[in-house]
């Protein structure tokens, strides 16, 4: 079939657009880079504060160690390196990480942090998973989109909130105050068997409380709330 002059112009333009997109995607794949940075943070720290926009973070309890150990893994393309700032002020180690805005150049930053006991945590990520392992202390964890996984936790207060994502908790002691909230996702909390002041609710999902005693006068409180998802609070020996 012969094309009219206008049809040929449209066809050529479409081919040029497709070719440009293919070149951009191919170039992006070829230019992907990975960079790993590790460093210690020494001195008397009271707390850590991480504010990430795109990336996972894993916090590992370091027991009685004297320093914080940070490992940052960056992935990016077209040289669009994540912007990271860190500062120690008044006993607080603060880290902020932002990826440049781009439709084609994907960017992500992943952190692995080893932290001594009783250094408080304030961890926030816009898009990413938060993992806490073997930590003893007070922790606030939040992600807008991602899962929160907590294992081997023992501390005074735990506050974990996800906009969209599941929350799992395995505690090895009875924290005085535990708050678990998600807008969309399941909540599964495993606690030591005993008495707790429990508020376990789901607006759209099943609720299960087993192996623990719900007692309003108990010294330990547990709040597990999901807007859409199952909520399970259970005791283990």
Q: Over which residues does each language-model region extend?
A:
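Terminal targeting segments of Actinobacterial cell-envelope proteins
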Residues: 1-7
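Hydrophobic membrane-insertion alpha-helices, especially the h-region
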Residues: 7-26
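Short linear S-[DN]-x-LW-Φ motif typified by the pepsin-like aspartic protease active-site region
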Residues: 28-90, 110-114, 120, 132, ...
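Residues that act as N-cap/strand-start positions at coil-to-secondary-structure junctions
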Residues: 31-33, 44, 77-81, 107, ...
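Soluble periplasmic/extracytoplasmic beta-strand elements of cell-envelope proteins
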Residues: 47-51, 58, 94-96, 112-114, ...
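Structural motif
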Residues: 53, 89-90, 126, 135, ...
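Non-cytosolic head/periplasmic domains of membrane-anchored proteins
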Residues: 96-171, 175
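Short, surface-exposed interaction patches in beta-rich subdomains
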Residues: 151-237
